Amino acid sequence: MAKRKNKELLEIAQEIGGEEAVEVVKALEKMKEATDEELAEATGIRVNTVRRILYMLNDEGLADFKRIRDPETGWYYYYWRLETKKLPEIIRSRKMAELKKLKEMLEEETSEIYYWCGTEGHPKLTFDEAMEYEFQCPICGKMLMQYDNTHIIEELKRRIEELEIELGLKKKPRKTSKKKKSRSE
């Protein structure tokens, strides 16, 4: 698997199920195909957790299985493998969802004026909420001041533009170079 695809697969695994999911994916990459018990043994992760991770990967379209019945016991064994053919579509879909969420956050940040007491961990309040509390923090009682969210807005805009370029929805801006004046001018 190409390094970039592998990196993106591991990032998605991390989002889905944390470090344990990353370990399961790495083990499955090495083994190509394995049962949940084999993966549990290879990773040291409990079988129930491995199964949960495999089902989550399957729900995302990143893992698939084949079911084989043991003729002697009648039990079914599930052999799991990674399914990366749809990885580019999955990545694009996740990025589109992130883009939508960022645009909603930007809309929220630009459509409201927020107030805050300045204490880390205390809530930002909208104008209406600040009015309800008579411009005093509901936690510490300090006076609420208008919150400068320009850094948040700029970061959201930057990330939105970055995603739009990655997704091919927007062209990368060209760097403008300053023209040197000729001596004849």
Swiss-Prot record:
InterPro entries, A to Z: TF_E_archaea (IPR016481), TFE (IPR039997), TFIIE/TFIIEa_HTH (IPR017919), TFIIE_asu (IPR002853), TFIIEa/SarR/Rpc3_HTH_dom (IPR024550), WH-like_DNA-bd_sf (IPR036388), WH_DNA-bd_sf (IPR036390)
Single GO BP term: transcription initiation at RNA polymerase II promoter
Domain of life: Archaea
Keyword Transcription regulation: yes
UniProt keyword terms in alphabetical order: DNA-binding, Transcription, Transcription regulation
N-terminal signal peptide: none
UniProt-listed SMART domains: TFIIE
Any one GO MF annotation of this record: DNA binding
Entry keyword Transcription: yes
Pfam families cross-referenced by the UniProt entry: TFIIE_alpha (PF02002)
Domain HTH TFE/IIEalpha-type span(s) in chain numbering: 5-88
Family: Belongs to the TFE family.
HAMAP family per UniProt: TFE_arch
Domains (record comment): The winged helix domain is involved in binding to DNA in the preinitiation complex.
NCBIfam families: PRK06266.1, transcription factor E
Subunit structure: Monomer. Interaction with RNA polymerase subunits RpoF and RpoE is necessary for Tfe stimulatory transcription activity. Able to interact with Tbp and RNA polymerase in the absence of DNA promoter. Interacts both with the preinitiation and elongation complexes.
Physiological role: Transcription factor that plays a role in the activation of archaeal genes transcribed by RNA polymerase. Facilitates transcription initiation by enhancing TATA-box recognition by TATA-box-binding protein (Tbp), and transcription factor B (Tfb) and RNA polymerase recruitment. Not absolutely required for transcription in vitro, but particularly important in cases where Tbp or Tfb function is not optimal. It dynamically alters the nucleic acid-binding properties of RNA polymerases by stabilizing the initiation complex and destabilizing elongation complexes.
Protein name as catalogued: Transcription factor E
Gene name in the database record: tfe
